[in-house]
Amino acid sequence: MSRTAVVYFGCVVALACFVLARAISHWETEDPARFFVYLAFAFLAGTLKVRLPGITGTFSLNFLFVLIGVANLTSPETLVIAGTSMAVQSVWRSSNPARWIHLLFNVSAITICVQLAFTVARSFPLPFLLQLAVASGVYFLTNTILVSGILTLAEDKSFLAVWSRWFRWFLAYYGIGVTTTALILIVNRQTGWGYALLILPIMYLEYMCLCYDIKEVPGT
């Protein structure tokens, strides 16, 4: 990596360490059972990853748990769940010799994204669904910008070119994810979080749809 890329990498990791340390020092959980169930689901989500054509990196469904966390969990719980899922995504069935570097950056980036999305969404007395929309928008933009930034510096490419590829692929599936997450949360609010098992078939269906779409892309 270039010196600029190393500085960028270091700044992201340092900021994430500060955010995570502050969150863990204020750890709280309202329902430990719910936390561990969502953590297990997030672990599974990290294994459902695909490599997108023309893009360095992989995509998984861990953002579903960021949105669930903003709606139902505390900030520290959401950070741990999202970080765990991203760690699994980064190393699961990866033969890349630089996977541990990717792991460090990816977990750092998602930590920043989650905290920013959580803070912005919870800072205003918004209706439930609008809060979810705000969180998803902040997370989407922050995530794609941070990842595109390191790829631009490491690969000496145009930022807009890299970001637009991420944007095109992610946008449709973020939309689907936000919609399905909203439905799950509405059901959970009426019946209790035990219906979180509904997440599993939805996650797998979205994963299969993404795999199918990628196979339809010429050259993949």
Give residue spans per PLM region.
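Short helix-perturbing small/polar motifs within transmembrane alpha-helices
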Residues: M1-T58, L64-R165, W169-M208
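Cytosolic signal-transmission helices at domain junctions
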Residues: C211-T220
